[in-house]
């Protein structure tokens, strides 16, 4: 039941095969069984059951609100939720309870969806592993798959021993893990440079970054205003399209959203691939790209070609500058956005009896981790009067060149670009933390951040399993506001590769092992 698509579970609810309360209880049980993944910061059990009960009354009267009525969903903990603590996984916002819902959260609630809780992330969404938040790292559910335990984990020789667990990707790792572990049917993430697509690829789920301006950012605690986009994580492409249709559209509370009416996003059941042109950017054969991922990428291109599509190599000539450009622009906006956390209006405030300036400094020292403080420092350096033209202005000009590269390719007749999402499959946590956050992020964002700078839509789809039995995702990039075409192509690919979902039983067994380990540690 928990592995059904949105349309399937909606039909089951309508036919009375399961009630909204029963479905909510099953998801709550899954959350408890998979607590060891650390996917959630806050579980809103009481509120979820109340919302499910209200949904059940609507179904009994035949007045359900639509396909999402009674459907459990989760939200990354950098979206405001009325009456529910919103922390950004930071000491700075521990205890902060917003008085309003983010627009995307409210839209789902208005459709009768049931909020299960707030998911874990890197502090203030600054990271690519979901390892740097104050609530601890998120574990990738695939760490506990039989394929990985049998092939890839050096610590898995004994059945009663935990494997060397993998990172979930970031910064929306909690949302990706929550969907992959069947604790909800949909999760919201955020995507500034790949923070939805990266963890989706590592956790074997679909991750959609919409066109900038298609979905409201109101209530999303900002990282980089000019690049932030709410992301959607689901277990299949059509589910992502259903959610996007609900979320898309103008919001008077967000001046950057489109004014035009959004076209319906229903995906056709079949598509003539022979009419498409698929572009393969030659610059994306990047240093560090694993041989396996390269092979899956080539195989996917061959799949389109054998179906009649025109597959051509294209050039995005300014790609090599994109990571450095992204770093300058990202940290500059971070420095500006983080200035609001000063200990006065909301969030953490140091309790020392000191001057106002000393209070500011102490509050930020106590509230932010080293990663956040480091990015603030870098951003302020780039914004100094003597550096502004050489760094910030120059980076803005390069950003325009990067966006123009995409415009040129799409105007030449290319419909969709096909690229890797990540350099490789997920890595073990102990290996991941050997490198600092900045280095890791630069590596992990290499295929994803240029899309944010260009404001384009992109979706990652699980493509294959590596030799270690882990998911490898491929990314499709489309023209601005052409999500229907993008998702139609992605759906066709998804149906062709038929990627298998994670086995529910594997996670249940892993939960029992984790519980035994926890018990033995507490006893000793």
Curated annotation (Swiss-Prot):
Catalytic activity annotation: L-glutamyl-tRNA(Gln) + L-glutamine + ATP + H2O = L-glutaminyl-tRNA(Gln) + L-glutamate + ADP + phosphate + H(+)
GO BP annotation list: glutaminyl-tRNAGln biosynthesis via transamidation; mitochondrial translation; regulation of protein stability
Localization, UniProt: Mitochondrion
Keyword Methyltransferase assigned: no
Top EC class, one word: ligase
Main location as per UniProt: mitochondrion
Positions of the UniProt region annotated as Disordered: 146-168
Gene Ontology molecular-function annotations: ATP binding; glutaminyl-tRNA synthase (glutamine-hydrolyzing) activity
EC number: 6.3.5.7
GO CC terms, sorted: glutamyl-tRNA(Gln) amidotransferase complex; mitochondrion
Keyword list, A-Z: ATP-binding, Ligase, Mitochondrion, Nucleotide-binding, Protein biosynthesis
Residues the record marks as active site: 76 (charge relay system), 171 (charge relay system), 195 (acyl-ester intermediate)
UniProt entry tagged with the keyword Ligase: yes
Function: Allows the formation of correctly charged Gln-tRNA(Gln) through the transamidation of misacylated Glu-tRNA(Gln) in the mitochondria. The reaction takes place in the presence of glutamine and ATP through an activated gamma-phospho-Glu-tRNA(Gln).
Family membership noted in the UniProt record: Belongs to the amidase family. GatA subfamily.
Subunit-level organization: Subunit of the heterotrimeric GatCAB amidotransferase (AdT) complex, composed of A (QRSL1), B (GATB) and C (GATC) subunits.
Protein name according to UniProt: Glutamyl-tRNA(Gln) amidotransferase subunit A, mitochondrial
Organism name: Ornithorhynchus anatinus
Name of encoding gene: QRSL1
